[in-house]
Design a protein with these regions (language model features):
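Alpha-helical transmembrane segments of multi-pass membrane proteins
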Residues: 46-55, 441-448, 490
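Transmembrane helix-loop-helix hairpins at membrane boundaries of multipass inner-membrane proteins
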Residues: 1-9, 16-109, 177-189, 456-457, ...
């Protein structure tokens, strides 16, 4: 099947699953099965369409058969299709068991319509239709929030972003006479895109992507949504905002230097502040939402490095920045799906989302705990997992940036590299979470083979590294990294220690109390005290003070 046929089938499955899940919503279990199976099949078709275009390295165009909707699939947006398809597959399967909980409402209509709208936004050949489909997707996401206050906050901020994007589209139409992306690209080579339109687009799409300080809806929406919905917010909805920002920045291929620097600065602020705010949270979904902001910032750092490379006319910087950002976009979606779905499984079993109350959960849920440990290690960018591979390529782009002749680039390159370094169930549920964890391992170990595939999305070749170490050897070294401590322990351990007696810990003669146990809050306290002025900015400079705060 061609990529257009695959994408037609995928959208049809999403729409059919949404309609049938709504019609059978009176029977929750049946509705869950229909939504889950239909969404999983639609996601498979979507990922297959993206993989076909990416491996072929040639874009295709056509139309959706259900409606008169012109589409184009390039190797660049094929990466988004693969990301949406992989995450949608496991979220849909997970959602089948999710419907078995007594407190869960049917969500098949909203989730499948969200996926269909997201796919249509990615493949849109017209910027106006891109904005319309992104709006439909965002509205579906709003209805997935379980609390009306958080839904109103997201609705208000989302409509502000849409208004800015509509103004940007109107200005584009007045200036260029079209909203077709191919025609815009050709005409902007003669008449470059104005910075006023670019700023409107970056703010509008930035509200959708959740870049700081436009992130007001992100933690509240994630904390008050179901686990499948929260996973889609991070892996689908916010990534569409990044696609919009990148699309505007690449049109015409003549971006000025300050655009790239602005994206780098926004990425650095989002990555650092998002990771810092995560230390204050106890609700696991709210904590993961702030870590999503951190990774959105890291992805934006890579994409910003690519845009900076365009302005400086440095092909290696363009290739490294874009490939690193795109690979981390895919990797983040995988390991964040592991964590959100794993957190949902814990809530399903215990009824708690407070991490301070989940001590010893590994004994009750060993499979989910191991899978979440893999996801956490990937989020921490530890080798040999996929989070390390994407961030390492972004590091390389910063080193390349520091070698540039431009003074501002030589200044920002090392600073950005240092900033990035400090940022730091049931059967079907378990299968979905474990499968995603396995994907995280594969994404790291197989990075030497996967990264060249992503370079098809960048019209410039990656520079080959000057090394005599083969790709299989690199893979073996990555696999050996987590095994090395155990090997050293086995070799260096002495004779077996004598049996020890267990008793209460010595606490200066006082009785041991629960308050004496080291908690996550206490562990992070030194960092909170060191950055107290930054953390207080949430109260002093709150742009959404009229609605529920950050």
């Amino acid at each position: 099947m061609s990529a257009i046929s695959l994408i037609n089938s995928g959208v049809a499955w999403f729409v059919a699953a949404a309609v049938l899940a709504f019609l059978f919503s009176f029977q929750k279990a049946l509705s869950g099965w229909i939504a889950g199976i239909g969404g999983a099949v639609g996601s498979l078709y979507t990922a297959a369409a993206g993989f076909t275009v990416l491996t072929g390295a040639v874009g295709v165009s056509g139309a959706l058969s259900l409606v008169s909707y012109d589409v184009q699939i390039s190797p660049l947006n094929a990466i988004w299709l693969i990301t949406l398809g992989l995450c949608g597959l496991f979220v849909s399967l997970y959602n089948i068991d999710w419907h078995r909980h007594a407190q869960v409402k049917c969500n098949g209509l909203q989730i499948n319509m969200l996926m269909a709208a997201a796919v249509c936004a990615v493949i849109a050949s017209n910027l106006g239709m891109f904005v319309v489909m992104a709006e439909v997707m965002a509205l579906c996401a709003v209805f997935l929030t379980s609390n009306s206050k958080e839904g109103k906050l997201w609705f208000a901020l989302g409509r502000l972003g849409t208004l800015l994007l509509v103004i940007a589209c109107w200005l584009l139409w007045q200036r260029y006479g079209t909203l077709d992306l191919c025609l815009l690209d050709m005409r902007m080579q003669q008449l470059p895109l104005g910075s006023d339109i670019w700023l409107l687009g970056v703010i509008g799409f930035g509200l959708l992507a959740g870049i700081i300080p436009l992130h007001g809806w992100v933690p509240q929406a994630h904390a008050n949504a179901s686990a499948p919905a929260a996973a889609l917010f991070s892996t689908v909805v916010m990534k569409i905002g990044l696609l919009g920002m990148l699309t505007l920045s690449l049109l015409g291929g003549n971006a000025p230097l300050w655009w790239g620097i602005a994206l780098l600065v926004l990425g650095m602020i989002t990555a650092f502040v998002g990771g810092l705010y995560a230390l204050m949270e106890h609700n696991i979904q709210r904590l993961l939402a702030y870590h999503t902001l951190e990774n959105i910032g890291i992805i934006l750092l890579g994409l910003g490095a690519g845009v900076t490379g365009i302005a400086l006319e440095q092909p290696a910087l363009i290739a490294l920045g874009l490939v690193g950002g795109l690979y981390h976009l895919l990797n983040h979606s995988l390991f964040k799906s592991v964590l959100f779905l794993g957190a949902g499984s814990v809530w399903f079993r215990t009824g708690h989302r407070d991490i301070e109350k989940l001590g010893g959960i590994g004994k009750k849920m060993p499979v989910i705990s191991i899978a979440m440990l893999v996801g956490l290690m990937a989020m921490a960018a530890l080798p040999p997992l996929n989070g390390f591979a994407g961030e390492w390529v972004i590091y390389q782009s910063f080193f390349k940036l520091s070698n540039s002749g431009a003074f501002v680039a030589r200044l920002l390159g090392p600073l950005l590299a240092v900033g990035l370094a400090i940022t730091g169930a049931l059967a079907v549920m378990s299968v979905s979470v474990v499968a995603l964890a396995i994907c995280c391992v594969i994404g790291g170990v197989a990075a030497p083979w996967l990264l060249p595939m992503l370079s098809a999305a960048v019209p410039l070749p990656l520079e080959p590294a000057n090394t005599t170490v083969s790709q299989p050897m690199i893979t073996l070294l990555l696999i050996a990294c987590p095994l090395l401590p155990f090997i050293i322990m086995a070799i260096c351990k002495g004779d077996r220690l004598p049996s020890r007696s267990r008793g209460a810990a010595w606490v200066c003669g006082y009785d041991h109390e629960k308050s004496m146990v080291i908690t996550a809050h206490g562990f992070a306290m030194p960092v909170k005290q060191a950055f107290a002025p930054v953390l207080k900015l949430r109260k002093w400079l709150n742009p959404v003070s009229l609605v529920p705060g950050w």
